[in-house]
């Protein structure tokens, strides 16, 4: 180990930055974040440095560096493009016993500045010892995706209770186990969900009882349209800590594969005219699993609040006093349209966009047709495959031109994506002649005409299908 990883408290300490360019701006910003009193000296100052100086946030002097500037400084950073000046700063600082760092020159550094993941008060520092700053930045980027932003709030919460827990639980091992349950369980999830009062109440009860009870919770998570790269960080974190997952048929196999391997998987999907499990029973299955102390993942394709019946599920959970949180997902309209190269709004084609469901009821579609046939508007139809012919006929009958461009997207954003395009008059026959597999999405409006120019996503071994 070439360097000892340590954290310095420089709050209120005088720190000097020699240099006035973009590198100096980055160093000054970092020192300011840590609460240092920063002085900058350079013949010419970057406009950002000058702005900070004008606002009294730093002290800046437009002058050449002199040895006297180092006196009374806690640390010095040389960030000029003059290597001989940087070396001079290094030798003068070390001679006076002042910590010094020369930017991008490890051999003239008493300390190095790592790549930082900031979740204050939790700080993660990553360093390659100056060997490869790019590698350190790449590692930091990976860590940024793994550590929730709310860890800062969790750290502050833990700090408030540290002394009390130490007094209440005197055994080191017992205290460690207690903290592990707090920081990895439902109390931490309350913090992540912004429910600090509930977290405090649960921790107070745990302190009173001397143990952290196992409390179940439901995660209602949007799985997006299919491509696992479109999952949110929060969704992925909850997927990987669930004990049981209830999923529907709209969740792609690629997304389902990212759920914690040990989690029990229960299929509760629905197909047209066939329901595996009634919605009311799904609601109560979530309740029962949570009451067993399980972390319950309810994984839904797209977004749980857009034609996903998520509102019904959390209404039941709320009525049964089951803790829950909702994680939005990229809805199929947005995801499929983007991957098909069909913008839902466009200055020249559509100033509005409307989402509707195309499910048939007793062979009919109950929609507000007058609202749908407005000009310069895009219509996105979820679950519209079975009623596509009726949909197109009704739109034409209510005044929409038969030549209006229309598209059907099959299994959008995945390697099984297909795009069929036509018009209101021709699309039903085009689709009828193809082997189409759900889930599908129908897009209607002038924006569909842009598809041939804007289609960018290429399915492996198959070009997007334009069956006009």
From Swiss-Prot:
Which keywords fit this entry according to its UniProt record?
A: Cobalamin biosynthesis, Lyase, Methyltransferase, Multifunctional enzyme, NAD, Oxidoreductase, Phosphoprotein, Porphyrin biosynthesis, S-adenosyl-L-methionine, Transferase
Q: Which reaction does it catalyse?
A: uroporphyrinogen III + 2 S-adenosyl-L-methionine = precorrin-2 + 2 S-adenosyl-L-homocysteine + H(+); precorrin-2 + NAD(+) = sirohydrochlorin + NADH + 2 H(+); siroheme + 2 H(+) = sirohydrochlorin + Fe(2+)
Q: Where does S-adenosyl-L-methionine bind?
A: 225, 301-303, 306, 331-332, 383, 412
GO MF annotations for this entry? Answer: NAD binding; precorrin-2 dehydrogenase activity; sirohydrochlorin ferrochelatase activity; uroporphyrin-III C-methyltransferase activity
Binding site residues for NAD(+) = 22-23, 43-44
Q: Which residues carry this modification: Phosphoserine?
A: 128
Where on the tree of life does the source sit, at the highest rank? Bacteria
Q: Which residues form the active site?
A: 248 (proton acceptor), 270 (proton donor)
Q: What Pfam families does the entry give?
A: CysG_dimeriser (PF10414), NAD_binding_7 (PF13241), Sirohm_synth_M (PF14824), TP_methylase (PF00590)
Region annotation (Precorrin-2 dehydrogenase /sirohydrochlorin ferrochelatase) ranges? 1-203
Q: Name the pathway it acts in.
A: Cofactor biosynthesis; adenosylcobalamin biosynthesis; precorrin-2 from uroporphyrinogen III: step 1/1; Cofactor biosynthesis; adenosylcobalamin biosynthesis; sirohydrochlorin from precorrin-2: step 1/1; Porphyrin-containing compound metabolism; siroheme biosynthesis; precorrin-2 from uroporphyrinogen III: step 1/1; Porphyrin-containing compound metabolism; siroheme biosynthesis; siroheme from sirohydrochlorin: step 1/1
What the entry lists under CDD domains is as follows: SUMT
EC nos: 2.1.1.107, 1.3.1.76, 4.99.1.4
Sequence segments annotated as region (Uroporphyrinogen-III C-methyltransferase): 216-468
Stored SUPFAM superfamilies: NAD(P)-binding Rossmann-fold domains, Siroheme synthase middle domains-like, Tetrapyrrole methylase
Give one GO biological process term. Answer: cobalamin biosynthetic process
The answer on whether this UniProt entry bears the keyword Iron reads no
Q: HAMAP family, per this entry?
A: Siroheme_synth
Family indicated by similarity? In the N-terminal section; belongs to the precorrin-2 dehydrogenase / sirohydrochlorin ferrochelatase family.
Q: What does this protein do?
A: Then it catalyzes the NAD-dependent ring dehydrogenation of precorrin-2 to yield sirohydrochlorin. Finally, it catalyzes the ferrochelation of sirohydrochlorin to yield siroheme.
Put simply, this protein is called Siroheme synthase
């Amino acid at each position: 180990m070439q360097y000892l990883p340590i954290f310095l408290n420089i709050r209120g300490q005088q720190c000097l930055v020699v240099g006035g360019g973009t590198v100096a701006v980055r160093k000054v910003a970092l020192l300011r974040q840590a609460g240092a009193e920063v002085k900058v000296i350079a013949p010419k100052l970057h406009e950002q440095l000058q702005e900070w100086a004008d606002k009294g946030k730093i002290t800046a002097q437009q002058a050449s560096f002199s040895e006297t500037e180092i006196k009374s400084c806690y640390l010095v950073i040389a960030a000029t493009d003059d290597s001989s000046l940087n070396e001079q700063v290094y030798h003068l600082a070390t001679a006076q016993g002042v910590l010094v760092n020369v930017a991008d020159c490890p051999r003239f550094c008493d300390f190095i500045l790592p790549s930082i993941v900031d979740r204050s008060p939790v700080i993660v520092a990553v360093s390659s010892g100056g060997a490869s700053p790019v590698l350190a930045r790449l590692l930091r980027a990976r860590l940024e995706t793994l550590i929730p932003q709310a860890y800062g709030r969790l750290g502050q919460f833990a700090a408030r209770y540290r002394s009390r827990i130490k007094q209440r639980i005197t055994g080191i091992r017992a205290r460690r186990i207690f903290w592990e349950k707090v920081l990895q369980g439902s109390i931490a999830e309350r913090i992540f969900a912004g429910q600090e009062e509930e977290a405090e109440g649960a921790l107070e009860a745990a302190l009173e009882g001397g143990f952290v009870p196992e409390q179940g919770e439901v995660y209602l998570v949007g799985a997006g349209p299919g491509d696992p790269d479109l999952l949110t960080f929060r969704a992925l974190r909850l997927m990987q800590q669930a004990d049981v997952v209830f999923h529907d048929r709209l969740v792609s196999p690629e997304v389902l594969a990212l759920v914690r391997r040990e989690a029990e998987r229960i299929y509760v999907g629905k197909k047209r005219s066939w329901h595996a499990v009634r919605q009311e029973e799904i609601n109560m299955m979530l309740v029962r699993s949570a009451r067993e102390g399980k972390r319950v993942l309810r994984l839904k394709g797209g977004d749980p609040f857009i034609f996903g019946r998520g509102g019904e599920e959390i209404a039941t959970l709320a009525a049964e006093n089951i803790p829950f949180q909702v994680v939005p997902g990229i809805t199929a309209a947005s995801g499929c349209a983007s991957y098909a190269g069909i913008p839902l709004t466009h200055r020249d084609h559509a100033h509005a966009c409307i989402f509707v469901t195309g499910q048939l009821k007793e062979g009919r579609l109950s929609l507000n047709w007058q609202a749908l046939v407005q000009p310069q508007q895009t219509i996105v139809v979820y679950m519209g495959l079975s009623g596509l012919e009726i949909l197109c006929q009704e739109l034409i009958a209510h005044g929409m031109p038969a030549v209006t461009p229309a598209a059907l997207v099959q299994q959008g954003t995945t390697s099984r994506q297909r795009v069929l395009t036509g018009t209101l008059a021709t699309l039903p026959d085009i689709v009828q002649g193809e082997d189409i597999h759900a889930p599908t999405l129908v897009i209607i409006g002038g924006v569909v005409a842009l598809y041939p120019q804007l289609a960018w996503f290429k399915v492996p071994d198959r070009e997007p299908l334009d069956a006009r």
